Amino acid sequence: AMTTRLVGSEMCIRDRYMGPLIKTQMTRCIHCTRCIRFATEVAGVPELGAIGRGENMQITTYLEKAMESELSANVIDLCPVGALTSKPYVFEARPWELKKTETIDVMDAVGSNIRVDTYGWEVKRVLPRINEEINEEWISDKTRYACDGLKNQRLDTPYVKINNKLKPSSWDEAFKAVSERISKTKSEKIAGFIGDMTNMETTYAAKDFFEKTIKSENLESRYEKLYINTNVRSNYLFNSSIEGIEKSDLIILIGTNPRFEATILNSRIRKNYLKNKTEIISLGDVGDLTYPYQVIANNTDTIKDIIDNKHEISEKIKKSKYPCVIFGQSVLKLKSAPYIFEEFKNYLLENDKISDDWNALNILSKNSSTVGSYDLNVLSKNSSYEILDKLENNEFEILILFGQDNLNFEKKNEFIIYIGSHGDKGASIAD
């Protein structure tokens, strides 16, 4: 007689909907609850839970809806049995067929460590690499899934505009069109703009080209009217470090929403809050963050009160051993930005919050190439205000865009040269 026959009941559970990124096969689930703990503790969105008891227990999203977290796909890496897998990657390739390349993420300024898996010329998936100083073992969903846009609208050959239509051309024809136009134009009428994801090698080559060949100082890496002081490198860095956030005992957000501007950084702030119940204060109501925070104002007058020791926050900063003040880009766009930044910096210096041991002053950049461009001093001679005003007034005759797609101006008679990898907004207006 057979002694291996199954006598008990089999577990057969219908697959749950968890959104467009996570594919579920719940019959594989062993109820380890890693995904529940991740959603509740790390992501800060308690949308996963267990219902039922004993052998009837099931993992589910409470209302059959997508996980509303920018870290949601990390549950795929956490699941030990393949009950949660990547929906866009399913049936795309076998792991042993893929070439694995270790690299750095460019979707934000954090620089998460990632591994890119390619099959032939196609990027199939992006996975996190462990780096305890930066991203630990997490990456944002944007980092993980932005690769699906890489194969669309690739610029694989030069294009020249003929009769208002971009037509493929040879490199010789493209260079001839560019050199003829540049040689007939005065250097002060030529401007260049560096893009958000332009690597430092290209940026340096562009700077060299503008200084030595064109002899123009109109090269700018900012596409918005931003105040930045590049006299000292610490004026534009995240000085407390991402890992340092964990020991901070007071966090002040000034005009920034780290949940969307730097997702991985936000997870560190949440980690600190859960561990130490650190006080988090925000100047500006930034909406739903994954931890409790106190909004003290929606205007910049409060900053002046803090500097003048007229606000309760002043005393908290003085008493704090490791304060962390994070300036967002939205503050640096203000006309009062030079005053706000410099005075707040002086205030921190006076109270010994900027020293060799700990620097409380932090700038949270949005783009991966920002700090590299500042390091290379790719900033127009006077300020971004002047060059962007000239751009809006159509004072330039030639614009060279190095992967820059965010400029806000109306094209009139400018001759636009676009250098980039994809047919984005910049390529569509190029000549």
Feature roles, as predicted:
Residues 10, 14, 46-59, 226-228:
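Short, conserved phosphate-binding/catalytic loop or strand-edge motifs used
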Residues 3, 47-49, 113-115:
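Short, surface-exposed charged micro-motifs
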Residues 21:
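Extended, Lys/Arg-rich, non-catalytic nucleic-acid recognition/anchoring regions
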Residues 25-26, 32, 36-37, 43, ...:
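Catalytic alpha/large subunits of respiratory electron-transfer oxidoreductases
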Residues 18, 29, 41, 46-49:
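Hydrophobic alpha-helical bundles that form the membrane domains of multi-pass transporters
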Residues 1-8, 12-13:
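Single conserved hydrophobic/aromatic residue that forms the stacking wall/gate
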Residues 48, 84-85:
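Short hydrophobic beta-strand motif reused across regulatory alpha/beta modules
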